[in-house]
């Protein structure tokens, strides 16, 4: 249970880290929030690693946006500076990713001006990592624990090299801060750029303090100070530049609200005149670590669970020398009062002996000076006294050794007693643990019983669902057979009709030849021949129509056969898979349940037998005890023997109990092994399901490729550049969510949620399909063949990249990979896919008109209220619709023109009523679209504001605004055209074109809402119904206009039966010439229309 709890906590912390990284690297051009960066730093201190942080960084779509990339570099810099020391070690292997960020913006000028800053920032971070790799004794803020007390220098060459490397890094900081100041914008906020100055100020000041202390130590140690003159000159230059840098930073109010900017004196500190110069300690590998003073920039953590610093308070300029604390004396752990007294007595005896020796020596010297003659005797006496003194000292030392030995024996005895008590306590803890494990095993057994019952219920439910699906498939197969039979009958009837018409055609040809031979000079024969020719032409036309109808029916029949055959095969395949899965599941579950029940029954039987035997033994013991009590005084010896027998029986029963406990442990181990195998088989089945879902996504992408290359599929003809950009943004978000879901699936292992992966595959493949379909539709309206081929080629490359992405995630390819390798694979493929999407986005932006570019500028402007912009646009559209309705009503209320006939007045009234119906349907459509976008924003914004949601999904907002404007313009054009038709200034063809424009604008608005609509949304269904109503009203108006035009043509129909052969031939040639001219005019008009549409993408609409 503890391992599951730890795994759950680890998953929660990873999810919290992912959220903090995503919020710290948001798309907004603001500084990363302190609490999000602090969460990342605390994570490295809590887990002593930075690998999850780098994984979270690489999962985000940073390379698609320059602001996100720059904010990510700031976050990485803060983690390297204030995070755990393992962050510097783990980041050494991530230099390749940093170089990828640099290459992404190499040689390009970005719209917001971050490309140069990103390249310089990456260069500095790589330089910093190289420095820490060469000098691992430094932390992120350059506070070396062993360099605090600088008194003596062991190796001046090493100190010189360290100072030289740190000065190079200080120069790099100075170059980068100058680049930052030169890129400040006057019109926009510079919070994001100022945030990069915070770690630079902290690191530069830490390096400055260290250089000051190190140079003072070198000057106090080196014999030739002139060798340090280059370093001194460079130090002074850096001092003045650093002072200017801090002065510039003090003028930034936002920066001073975050940190305290240091203040340096005008003149650099004196490096040679300080008497209290600290010494330079030895290397960390050769001395034991000493306690260090507190750092003023980034306090070092203490204890086992350190916490990183939050506020960075810089000291004054006078506090250059770091604090120093002397090492504390080591206390004797085995100190004892009796031993202290003994040692004091020994020291007193030694001092007395020394005093006696000194006194004897003084007396000997005086006697030697006075009595030179007795020198030999005195020397002998002194030798004897020294020998006696030596013997006394040896006796004292022996007594002290004996006392020390006795004290050590007592201490060893005490340690043995304490060890024995510890072993007893440990045995008691093991006994309690064994009891707890027994209770836990009973609870686990109950859980297994409940799980078996749950699996039985699931098995029965799966069987019921399988039977229902089988019945549904049978009904579907039966309906398909009926449809096939119906189409077959239609085909046979058409074949018979075609045979009959062909026979009639042959008969007419034979009659025509006979009449042509007989009627060479008679006018009557000529008339009959012409009549026969006309009849033959009509028959030929009917025959051609029937042939076309036959070919169309044959094609539809083949298509229906093919689709029904594919559906039947897929249904049969799914049915077989379901049957096999159900059978295998039933076999596995039944065998597992039977095995578990048999084991449980056997174990219960063994335990019951043991319990009964123990009860019988206790009953026998009770009887024997009663009998022995009655015969106690008479049979004392027999009682003792019986007690011995009873003791042996109890020992045997205890042995049996221990054996039963061992057997139970073996059973539990076997059950755990079987459960692990069952889980492994279930995981393999789930992997197969994920592979099948990936295969379905690839099949959908293949369909998209076929439709993209097929001339029979025109794509979405109503697609606009704004809508294309919104679908690309949706595809980018779905790709990121899909990558995140798969990384979680790889990282969680058996505890992974497969539903997120399956949902992510479906959403990802659908989004790519929509991008390709809309891209093809937009490419057909550009009028530029080369540009159209380029656009379709980019879409084809995107679909192929998505197929490669899905193909690389099959279990066959990833089964033998490590989790980190799998995660890197998903991240790399996602980055490559985002690059393709970025290319398609850049090419699509070429088709935006000036109005759309102005909309984009308003969306990206920091001071604009996006909520009011969107609401005002929808309100203006609704107001335009209401004005159109009022205008139509005013036109209808005008007095009728007396010069028009009643039929013409009736036609005008019907056209006005149909136009009013269209505008009313459009008004309902606008209301439904307003409700739909309100629902989308309410469910998608979460805790953020509406304006933040619109800015985050700016492409979708552009498409929505553009679609609303298109509806308003199309409605206005329809009203003006209807007024022109009534007044006689416009033709019926103008009205048909206006209706088609309304239908296209309606489809664009519905598609813009459908991109972000929720699944099974009632509001979206209402919007779809309103769009259908508008389309039906437009079709009704078009049919009405066409019927009026057809009646006019019938009135103007000429009679050609009275014309002669020559006149008829001349009329026919003139008509063909007119048709050819009209066709040429039609081609030219279409070319002009293509040019106008192409130009409309670059010129503002009036």
Curated annotation (Swiss-Prot):
A biological process (GO) of this protein is:
clathrin coat assembly
Q: What does this protein do?
A: Required for cellular morphogenesis and polarization of the cortical cytoskeleton. Required for establishment of new polarized growth zones where it acts in actin organization. Involved plasma membrane internalization and is essential for fluid-phase endocytosis.
Q: Which cysteines are joined by disulfide bonds?
A: none
The gene name reads: end4
Please give the GO cellular component terms listed in this UniProt entry: actin cortical patch; cell cortex of cell tip; cell division site; clathrin-coated vesicle; cortical actin cytoskeleton; cytoplasm; endocytic patch; medial cortex
Q: Where is this region: Disordered?
A: 265-334
What residue ranges carry the coiled-coil annotation?
338-661
| Biased composition regions of type Polar residues, renumbered to the chain | 292-305
One Pfam family per UniProt:
ANTH
Q: Which UniProt keywords apply?
A: Actin-binding, Coiled coil, Cytoplasm, Cytoskeleton, Endocytosis
Give the species this sequence originates from: Schizosaccharomyces pombe (strain 972 / ATCC 24843)
Q: Which family does it belong to?
A: Belongs to the SLA2 family.
Q: Where is each I/LWEQ domain found?
A: 858-1100
| The name this protein goes by in its record | Endocytosis protein end4
What residues does the ENTH domain cover?
A: 9-139
A GO molecular function term, named singly, is: clathrin adaptor activity
PANTHER family reported for this sequence: HUNTINGTIN INTERACTING PROTEIN 1 (PTHR10407:SF15)
Q: Please indicate which superkingdom the organism of origin belongs to.
A: Eukaryota
Localization terms from the record = Cytoplasm, Cytoskeleton
């Amino acid at each position: 249970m503890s391992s599951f709890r730890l795994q759950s906590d680890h998953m929660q912390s990873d999810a919290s880290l992912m959220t903090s990284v995503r919020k710290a690297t948001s798309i907004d051009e603001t500084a990363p929030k302190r609490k999000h960066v602090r969460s990342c730093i605390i994570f490295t201190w809590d887990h002593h690693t930075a690998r999850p942080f780098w994984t979270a960084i690489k999962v985000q779509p940073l390379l698609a946006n320059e602001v996100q990339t720059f904010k990510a570099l700031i976050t990485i810099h803060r983690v390297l500076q204030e995070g755990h020391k393992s962050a510097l070690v783990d980041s050494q292997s991530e230099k390749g990713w940093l170089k990828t960020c640099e290459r992404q913006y190499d040689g390009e000028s970005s719209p917001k001006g971050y490309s140069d800053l990103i390249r310089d920032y990456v260069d500095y971070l790589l330089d910093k990592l190289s420095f820490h790799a060469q000098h691992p004794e430094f932390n992120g803020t350059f506070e070396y624990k062993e360099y605090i007390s600088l008194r003596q220098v062991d190796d001046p060459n090493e100190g010189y090299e360290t100072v030289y490397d740190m000065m190079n890094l200080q120069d790099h900081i100075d170059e980068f801060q100058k680049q930052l100041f030169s890129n400040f914008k006057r019109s926009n906020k510079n919070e994001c750029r100022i945030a990069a100055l915070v770690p630079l100020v902290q690191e530069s000041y830490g390096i400055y303090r260290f250089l000051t202390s190190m140079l003072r130590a070198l000057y106090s140690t080196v014999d030739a100070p002139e060798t340090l003159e280059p370093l001194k000159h460079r130090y002074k230059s850096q001092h003045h530049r650093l002072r200017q840098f801090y002065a510039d930073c003090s003028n930034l109010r936002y920066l001073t609200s975050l940190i305290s900017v240091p203040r340096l004196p005008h003149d650099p500190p004196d490096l040679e005149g300080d008497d209290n110069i600290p010494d330079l300690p030895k290397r960390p590998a050769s001395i034991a670590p000493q306690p260090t003073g507190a750092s003023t920039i980034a306090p070092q953590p203490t204890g086992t669970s350190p916490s990183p610093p939050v506020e960075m308070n810089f000291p004054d300029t006078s506090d250059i020398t770091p604090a120093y604390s002397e090492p504390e004396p080591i206390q004797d752990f085995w100190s004892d009062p009796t031993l202290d007294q003994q040692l004091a007595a020994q020291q007193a005896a030694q001092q007395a002996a020394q005093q006696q020796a000194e006194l004897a020596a003084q007396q000997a010297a005086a006697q030697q000076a006075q009595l030179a003659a007795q020198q030999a005797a005195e020397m002998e006496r002194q030798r004897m006294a020294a020998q006696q003194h030596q013997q006394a000292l040896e006796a004292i030392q022996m007594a002290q050794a004996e006392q020390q030995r006795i004290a050590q024996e007592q201490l060893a005895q005490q340690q043995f007693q304490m060890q024995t008590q510890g072993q007893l306590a440990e045995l008691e803890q093991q006994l309690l643990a064994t009891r707890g494990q027994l209770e836990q095993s009973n609870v686990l057994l109950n859980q297994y019983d409940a799980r078996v019952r749950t699996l039985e219920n699931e098995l029965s439910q799966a069987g019921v669902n399988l039977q229902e699906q089988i019945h549904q498939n049978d009904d579907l197969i039966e309906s398909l057979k009926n449809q096939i039979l119906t189409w077959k009958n239609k085909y046979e009837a058409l074949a018979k009709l075609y045979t009959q018409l062909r026979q009639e055609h042959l008969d007419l040809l034979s009659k025509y030849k006979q009449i042509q031979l007989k009627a060479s000079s008679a006018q009557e024969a000529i008339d009959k021949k012409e009549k026969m020719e006309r009849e033959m032409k009509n028959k030929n036309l009917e025959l051609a129509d029937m042939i076309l109808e036959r070919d169309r029916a044959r094609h539809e029949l083949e298509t229906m056969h093919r689709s029904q055959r594919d559906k039947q095969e897929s249904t049969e395949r799914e049915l077989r898979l379901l049957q096999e899965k159900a059978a295998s599941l039933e076999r596995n579950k039944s065998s597992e349940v039977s095995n578990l029940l048999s084991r449980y029954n056997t174990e219960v039987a063994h335990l019951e037998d043991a319990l009964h035997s123990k009860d019988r033994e206790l009953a026998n013991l009770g009887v024997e005890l009663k009998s022995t009590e009655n015969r106690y005084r008479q049979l004392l010896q027999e009682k003792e023997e019986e007690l011995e027998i009873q003791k042996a029986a109890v020992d045997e029963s205890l042995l049996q109990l221990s054996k039963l406990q061992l057997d139970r442990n073996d059973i539990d181990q076997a059950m755990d092994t079987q459960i692990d195998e069952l889980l492994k088989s279930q995981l393999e089945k789930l992997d197969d399901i994920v592979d099948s879902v990936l295969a379905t996504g690839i099949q959908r992408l293949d369909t998209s490729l076929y439709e993209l290359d097929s001339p029979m599929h025109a794509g979405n003809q109503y697609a606009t550049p704004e809508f294309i950009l919104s679908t690309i943004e949706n595809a980018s978000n779905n790709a990121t969510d899909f990558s995140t879901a798969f990384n979680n699936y790889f990282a969680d292992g058996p505890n992974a949620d497969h539903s997120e992966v399956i949902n992510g595959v479906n959403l990802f493949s659908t989004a790519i399909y929509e991008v390709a379909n809309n891209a093809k539709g937009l490419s057909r309206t550009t009028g530029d063949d080369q540009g159209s081929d380029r656009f379709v080629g980019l879409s084809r490359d995107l679909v192929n990249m998505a197929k490669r992405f899905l193909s690389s995630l099959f279990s066959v390819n990833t089964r033998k990979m490590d989790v980190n390798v799998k995660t890197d694979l998903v991240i790399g493929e996602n980055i490559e896919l985002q690059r393709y999407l970025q290319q398609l986005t850049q090419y699509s932006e070429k088709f935006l008109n000036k109005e759309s570019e102005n909309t984009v500028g308003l969306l990206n402007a920091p001071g604009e209220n996006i909520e009011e912009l969107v609401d005002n646009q929808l309100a203006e559209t609704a107001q335009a619709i209401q004005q159109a309705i009022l205008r139509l009503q005013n036109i209808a209320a005008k007095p009728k023109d007396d010069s028009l006939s009643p039929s013409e007045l009736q036609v005008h009234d019907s056209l006005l009523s149909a136009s009013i119906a269209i505008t009313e349907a459009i008004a309902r459509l606008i209301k439904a679209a307003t409700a739909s976008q309100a629902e989308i924003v309410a469910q998608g914004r979460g805790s953020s504001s509406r304006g933040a949601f619109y800015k985050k999904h700016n492409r979708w907002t552009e498409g929505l605004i553009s679609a609303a404007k298109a509806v308003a313009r199309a409605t206005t054009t329809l009203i003006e055209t209807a007024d022109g038709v009534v007044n006689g200034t416009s033709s019926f063809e103008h009205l048909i074109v206006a209706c088609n424009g309304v239908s296209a604008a309606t489809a664009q608005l519905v598609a813009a809402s459908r991109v972000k609509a929720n699944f099974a949304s009632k509001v979206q269904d209402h919007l779809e119904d309103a769009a259908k109503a508008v389309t039906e009203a437009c079709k009704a108006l078009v049919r009405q206009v066409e019927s009026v035009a057809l009646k006019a043509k019938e009135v103007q129909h000429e009679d050609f039966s009275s014309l002669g052969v020559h006149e008829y031939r001349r009329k026919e040639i003139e008509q063909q010439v007119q048709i050819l001219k009209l066709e040429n005019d039609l081609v030219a008009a279409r070319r002009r229309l293509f040019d106008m549409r192409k130009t409309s993408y670059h010129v503002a609409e009036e």
